[in-house]
Amino acid sequence: MKTRKHTLALMAFFIGVTNVFAQIEGDKIFKNTQILTIELTFHQTSFFDSLEANYLTAEYMKADLVLTDSTGTYSYPEVGVRLKGNSTYNHPNNKKAFKIDFNEYVSGQKHDGIKKLNFSNNFKDPSMMREKVFFDVCKAAGVLVPRSNFANVYFNGTLWGFYTVVEQIDDQFLDWAILDDDGNLFKAGDNFGGSNTPADLVYYGSTASDYTDRYELKTNEDVNDMTDLIDFMDFVNNSTSANFESQLFNKMELNEYLRSVALDNMFSNFDSYTGSARNYYMYHNMSTDKWEWVKWDGNEAFGSYPAGGGGGPGGGGNNVLTIDPDYHDADRPLLENIFASTSLYHAYLLEYCDILENYFNSSYIDPIIDSHYNLIKSSVYADNNKMYTDADFDNNISSNVSSGSGPGGGTIYGLKSFISSRVSYLEGEIDCDDIVSVEDMDKVENLELFPNPASEQITLKWENGVGLDIKILDSKGVLVYQNNPEYINSLNVDVDSWATGIYHLVFTSSNGTAKSQTFSILR
């Protein structure tokens, strides 16, 4: 079985080699797992009433901030603070999720290059670490996710609670994670409360107003052009099966997306595109002209969000422990078309098996859980505004916890028991030894090129082959075309602008096996 390494891992290595002193913005907060101390001082009387009054309008309030991390203590006057969240706002105490904007009132104010921080209140999570563990595993497996950590938060000298700190997806994130921040960044709409505007990637027409309730542009707002996203949805929904299969890798970073989908499925994280069709970002990388997928909001991972309704223990819907690898809600065309393609679904299973072998298992995840538990235990005990008891916190590390009805009620899966049960089911459903590995697929066979001679377009077809490098050279040996396709067995190349003459096609696969063919262009 293969082991893939995300580009980010290589990027971090080369950055470290070329400049050992270089730091990524936000390292002080996120590089090492730690518990920050956040002390906010509001000068308004009845400040929390004002925060609640501003919730629906997302209006900030001024507060002074003292932030302590592993590198020291830092003071910031007049940061912006506002409450946030959808279901998390139903937390029965005043421990609401919130956001800090360093730059809201003091232009240019940042902490270690970071302009905004999000604070999740661990709603519906007795373990107090679901989101952190989920993001840790996703990041290690090569998927784009925000960085996260923990914090003890004080409002006007009073301990308000223990929170999970989550990085903002903005141009700072794009700078370090993707190395490109010129493109359009879209956030999937909330679709909260059954508004019937899911960010489902269904094509509703060519007019931007058809999508403004579904996707929010977060960069290049002055230009406010959604054409690129609409074009992508047009491609997903209206391409022929053959064109979708052959061109998807040209449209998005497919390897990372397939891994992202696999992780949502394994963790039964269905408050995502797979289920609710929200809680994700899409970024159009201008350096590669490909879309990149970024996860968001993992607080209901480990099966806390029902799959198709009622998916918890004893629920009437799908049992989230026994969800098949190709599960998705209806009207999710990107997933539907991927799973309908033999080659793309095979590519998905390759990524799925790699993650199952190397990341989604008790041997890998249990030590992460134990480490976080030992770090946060005393802080969780000190949080008098948490939804659950200290015993619930201790027990939910390994066992299910049940509570009453209402927001956050019901049965919440234990972290370790969920992983163990889910892995046991998946290993019975997928025989990863039967999934052809990269090594078995290296050899290109039955290469076809037609028509020959050609005038406007050539079609290439082949069998097998992974890690392909396709080059076309003219009669003088000048490179006129190069591509590195993944997970496909055919490719169309437009040649209508090429000069008439003889050309040489060279196919090289990852094991060094090469095949070549000569063709001509006549008009």
Predicted regions located by residue number:
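Conserved oxyanion/phosphate-binding beta-strand-loop segments in alpha/beta enzyme cores
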Residues: 63-121
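Internal "kinase-insert"/substrate-recognition segments embedded within catalytic cores
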Residues: 97-107, 121-122, 141-146, 158-267, ...
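Middle-to-C-terminal accessory/interaction subdomains
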Residues: 24-29, 33-36, 46, 55, ...
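A conserved alpha-helical element in kinase catalytic cores
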Residues: 123-143
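Bacterial Sec-dependent N-terminal signal peptides
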Residues: 1-24, 438, 523
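Short, well-structured beta-strand/strand-turn elements
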Residues: 141-152, 272
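C-terminal outer-membrane/trafficking sorting elements
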Residues: 18-21, 441-450, 454-523
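Short beta-strand/loop motifs in extracellular/secreted proteins, especially
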Residues: 61-63, 96-98, 149, 466-470
